UniProtKB/Swiss-Prot annotation:
Keywords: Cell membrane, Glycoprotein, GPI-anchor, Lipoprotein, Membrane, Signal. One of its GO terms (biological process) is flocculation. One of its GO terms (cellular component) is external side of plasma membrane. The lineage of its organism: Eukaryota, Fungi, Dikarya, Ascomycota, Taphrinomycotina. The keyword Cell membrane applies. This is Putative GPI-anchored protein pfl2. A lipid is attached at residue 1011 (GPI-anchor amidated serine). May be involved in agglutination during conjugation or other aspects of colony formation. Induces flocculation when overexpressed. Residues 88-130, 147-183, 243-710, 722-862, 885-918, 978-1011 are annotated as: Disordered. It comes from the Eukaryota. Coiled coil: none annotated. Residues 1012-1036 form a propeptide.
Length: 1036
């Protein structure tokens, strides 16, 4: 054990959650350490925010919204597993009394590897790796099975199909599509991509294949890509596999024959994993597999990625993308899956899940799994689907669930392109079992269930249940089991089923269930924001030897020897569950130092109307001008957020500002972040007799336009004093023989700079809490020290708080007006009489004068925004251990005649950390709270409303503003995000602040980015309750 003074802040490796938050230590001299003791007593991250009266979330932006994001987002799941499972290369079974057994060949694309084909013994019309087989499709050899630095790599791909008393058994062509196994520094790595289908009294059994995973630093790792599907007394069993992480090819397109004996089929297509696009602005959408089936055809199509079921199965193992299962074995000990696709079993010792989409069924009418977009229609000639939204047909025992699609971003636009949060539909007379995003389930009497990267799983009466990210599911004796996360569909009696975004399927009058699993987020290197994805929520439970969680994926184990996943390590064996409601906003700032946010903060405007890619056209008019700043007044146009094309604006106005010489105008207010600025035209007449500038309506676009509008105007009249034309609305200053000929002027916006700062101040109101548990008792005699321990204590604290702030937006514009004037003065003609000959009249030519006048100026205005928020929070800490260690016993011969008392009292004003006292008789004691085995649940919601006040000259307008703050408590770190949006007549402003706050409770500390260690706090108390010292106890 080591003791450190209270001024020492122990920082446990802070992790950046792809949000641009960087960790740094607070100044130990000014930032007191937050003790775990405090945490235990209900002081959530939100509570400690309260102790910082002023959280400066300050930032400025140049308004090109280049918020920085520290997300390099490679979806490579690094598996540090040595001697991981060796997967079987293929599955084959025999066929008897089968009317038709169509076994299209599986072409496996391998490079520099040995290709082994599976054996299909006693199989009628079964060919493996036959070049003449039906619909043999293989993909480009270059992008498949790329094995980097992998020696002794073996890739086998095979396909076998068998059927017993089955009307039809169709196995689509399996190409070891997108079977890109990137194995870095991996020796003895084997990748097998195989396909097997087996059916007993099954109408249809369809399986497809494949997919892959990236493994880093894995030795003796075997990746089983693609597996087998089996069904007992099941009407339909369809599986598909998931495409690999960086696969740009479309995953496998199977075809099935027509005029085949009718059979109810269910197919599932899968999600394509994330793709990376270095130069393209938009992420590529990965059309992962598009199967087709023709009329009256027994269609069994499968695309990419998938899972299956097993009954009394010995083993279910999956290393990368895709699970496998076997029929008729028992007492299996192991099931491990890493990336992509899960599975579950009944009466099996194993249930494993991994990344994308799983599912199983026993005596179930239907069990289908997929990943990304399917579709159905009833008696339709054609069914086409692009993206989300599922449909199911009538009178079928169908269940469909869809979850959200991860948003995608492009480089030039800061706002996300779109994100449709799915909408599942299921039709009448269907028995429905629906599972949404990140919802796991199932296996009975299973000994082990382990999940890793994305994709979950749980069990019944099993020792372990693990859940992760994506969406799996199983069913026992159920009519339907459906899982989804993105969009599915099926078709009944359909001639054609076509899907744009990966996968369709068809079936005729079958009891069908379709499941779709989430699409992995897409990233491109130059994109500022990550595509999506909730950054994990780790869970671990008691008595576990090891529980580590990764970035974006958690895991649990009970009485398990080991449960491991990649990155990020939760503290101790504690179970930490966090949830928060609210919106985190579209932009993230980089927070560093002691709280000052440096980076991009943009301030807010208007409520965005949906995620449209094209903004509607808006028109508005206004007149008048601000005589102080020279900026035009205008009617506010509410720009649409997230549009890639700015609306077109038209406007007219007249009049001129005699002070600044700037034209009055109705301002064209282009949407923020638009790449196209509207073009405006206007005309006016008259001239300013003081400055000699023409009056005009000026196009004054404010905000972030990349192209300034072009303006033209004409005027007439001329001023004889200055030689400038007089306007039609002004009286010439004198009588003269001069008159104007023509005049023209141009107005150009040279530059515009917009800065924004938001300075919220957060204060927390009262907090209250209580501690319960078993009071420890102890005694001491003749110099002995007897520590006592209590367990099961719990603390609950609640509180309210407010957030107020002021946002100021200042814009400075530089403009230039150039005028070209041409003036003509006619000569005077004279005549006279006299003696003799008459005098000839003068013959002078007209005098033409041409001149140019340029006026430059600068205009600045500031727009203040104020807001106030109120929120409440509740924190509950359950479990944990309190140990009281007697310190410096009083009378060595005395004993404790009464048990110590423990109390929990909020600190001064409810904003500090609590005082925690233990008082015994006859001795001083030190109380140590062990946060291991404790559960911390923190929920904080905040709703903020306010107004934006805009003052331009003598005109003041107030626009409604909505702010949303989210406080997420996880472990010993708090992440606070505030987003403000206001409606302005000038531009779109969105202010977003983000801070990461540790458990520091000092009024002088401002949102630091540190993470406090999982430390134990001990407080020494005397008989009189006086605090002697505070220390941090670290267990070496």
């Amino acid at each position: 054990m080591k003791f450190f003074t209270a001024s020492t802040l122990f920082l446990l490796a802070a992790q950046s959650l792809n949000s641009g938050v960087s960790a740094s230590l607070s100044d130990p001299a000014n930032t007191p350490t937050i003790l775990a003791d405090d945490i235990v007593h209900g002081y959530t991250p939100a509570t400690y925010l309260s102790s910082v009266p002023t959280l400066l979330k300050r930032a400025t932006t140049s308004y090109n919204y280049n918020t920085s994001s520290a997300s390099s987002s490679s979806l490579t799941s690094s598996s540090a597993a040595s001697s991981s499972l060796t997967s079987s290369s293929s599955l084959a079974s025999s066929s008897t009394n089968s009317t038709t057994s169509a076994s299209p060949t599986s072409s496996s694309l391998t490079s520099s590897s040995a290709t082994s084909s599976s054996l299909a013994s006693s199989s009628t019309t079964s060919s493996s790796l036959a070049s003449s087989s039906i619909t043999s499709s293989s993909l480009a050899s270059s992008s498949i099975t790329s094995s980097s630095l992998a020696s002794s790599s073996t890739t086998s791909s095979s396909l076998a199909s068998s059927s017993t008393n089955s009307t039809t058994s169709a196995t689509p062509t399996s190409s070891a599509t997108s079977s890109s196994l990137s194995s870095t520094a991996a020796s003895n790595s084997a990748t097998s991509s195989s396909l097997a289908s087996s059916s007993l009294n099954s109408t249809t059994s369809a399986t497809a294949t494949s997919s892959s995973l990236s493994s880093t630093a894995a030795s003796n790792s075997a990746t089983s890509s693609s597996l087998a599907s089996s069904s007992l007394n099941s009407t339909t069993s369809a599986t598909a596999t998931s495409s690999s992480i960086s696969s740009t090819v479309s995953s496998s397109t199977p075809l099935t024959s027509s005029n085949s004996t009718t059979a109810a089929t269910s197919a599932s297509a899968t999600s394509s994993s994330a793709q990376y696009n270095t130069s393209s602005l938009l992420p590529s959408s990965t059309p992962s597999s598009t199967p087709l089936s023709s009329a009256n055809s027994t269609t069994a199509t499968s695309a990419s990625s998938t899972p299956l079921t097993s009954v009394n199965s010995t083993t279910t193992t999956s290393a990368s993308s895709t699970p496998l299962s076997s029929v008729s074995s028992a007492n299996s000990t192991t099931a491990t899956s890493t990336s992509s696709t899960p599975l579950s079993s009944v009466n099996s010792t194993t249930a494993t899940s991994a990344s994308s989409t799983p599912l199983t069924s026993v005596n179930s009418t239907t069990a289908t799994s997929a990943s990304s977009t399917p579709l159905t229609s009833v008696n339709s000639t054609s069914a086409t689907s692009a993206s989300s939204t599922p449909l199911t047909s009538a009178n079928s025992t169908t269940s469909t669930s869809v979850s959200s699609t991860a948003p995608s971003y492009n480089t030039s636009s800061v706002l996300p392109t779109s994100s449709v949060s799915s909408t599942p539909l299921s039709s009448a007379n269907s028995t429905t079992a629906t599972s949404a995003s990140s919802t796991p389930l199932s296996s009975v009497n299973s000994t082990t269930a382990t999940s890793a990267s994305s994709t979950p799983l749980s069990s019944v009466n099993s020792t372990t249940a693990t859940s992760a990210s994506s969406t799996p599911l199983t069913s026992v004796n159920s009519t339907t089991a459906t899982s989804a996360s993105s969009t599915p569909l099926t078709s009944v009696n359909s001639t054609s089923a076509t899907s744009a975004s990966s996968t369709p399927l068809t079936s005729a009058n079958s009891t069908t269930s379709t499941s779709v699993s989430s699409t992995a987020p897409s990233y491109n290197t130059s994109s500022v924001l990550p595509t999506s994805s909730v950054s994990s929520t780790p869970l671990s439970s008691a008595n576990s030897t090891t529980a580590t969680s990764a970035s974006s994926t958690p895991l649990t184990s009970v009485n398990s020897t080991t449960a491991t996943s990649a990155s990020s390590t939760p503290f101790g064996n504690s179970t930490i569950t966090s949830s928060a409601s609210g919106s985190t906003g579209e932009f993230t700032n980089t927070n560093s130092g002691n709280g000052d946010v440096s980076g991009s903060v943009t301030t807010p405007t208007s409520t965005p109307l949906s995620n449209s890619t094209v903004a509607p056209t808006s028109t508005f008019t206004s007149s008048g001008f601000n005589t102080t700043s020279g900026l035009p007044t205008s009617s506010a146009s509410t720009p649409l957020s997230n549009s890639t094309v700015a609306p077109t604006s038209t406007f007219t106005s007249s009049g001129f500002n005699t002070t600044s010489g700037l034209p009055t105008s109705s301002a064209s207010t282009p949407s923020s972040n638009s790449s196209i600025v509207p073009t405006s035209t206007f005309t006016s007449s008259g001239f300013n007799t003081t400055s000699g500038l023409p009056t005009s309506s000026a196009s004054t676009p404010l905000s972030n336009s990349t192209v300034a509008p072009t303006s033209t105007f004409t005027s007439s009249g001329f001023n004889t004093t200055s030689g400038l034309p007089t306007s039609s609305v002004s009286t010439p200053l004198s009588n003269s023989s001069a008159y104007p000929s023509s005049g023209s002027s141009t107005f150009s916006r040279l530059s515009s700079t917009l800065t924004s700062s938001i300075i919220p101040t957060e204060t927390f109101g009262s907090t209250s809490g209580s501690a319960t548990g078993t009071r420890p008792t102890g005694s001491s005699s003749q110099g002995s020290v007897v520590p006592t321990t209590s367990t099961g204590s719990s603390v609950t604290s609640t509180g309210t708080g407010t957030t107020t702030g002021v946002t100021e937006v200042t814009e400075t514009s530089t403009f230039e007006t150039t005028e070209i004037i041409t003036s003509t003065i006619e000569p005077t003609t004279a005549s006279g009489t006299g003696g003799g000959n008459p005098t000839a009249a003068p013959t002078n030519e007209p005098t033409v004068t041409t001149g140019t006048e340029t006026t430059e100026g600068t205009a600045t205005y500031t727009e203040p925004t104020t807001f106030t928020s109120t929120f409440s929070f509740t924190t509950t800490i359950i479990g944990g251990t309190t140990t009281i260690i007697p310190v410096n016993p009083g009378n060595p011969s005395s004993s404790v005649s009464a048990p110590p008392t423990t109390s929990f009292t909020p600190g001064p004003g409810g904003s500090g950390y609590p005082s925690y006292s233990n008082t015994t008789q006859g001795m001083n004691t030190t109380s140590i709270w062990n946060s291991s085995n404790s559960t911390i649940v923190s929920n904080v919601t905040a709703t903020i409303t306010g107004n934006v006040t805009i003052t331009t000259g003598d005109l003041t307008t107030i626009d409604p503003t909505t702010f949303t703050s989210t406080y997420l408590s996880s472990g010993f770190q708090t992440v606070s995000n505030t987003t403000a949006t206001s409606g302005s007549d000038d531009d779109v402003k969105t202010a977003s602040t983000s801070s990461s706050t540790s458990y520091t409770s000092s009024s002088s500390s401002s949102s630091s980015t540190t993470s406090a260690a999982s430390s134990k706090a001990s407080v020494s108390m005397g008989l009189n309750g006086l605090m002697i010292a505070a220390v941090i106890l670290l267990v070496a």
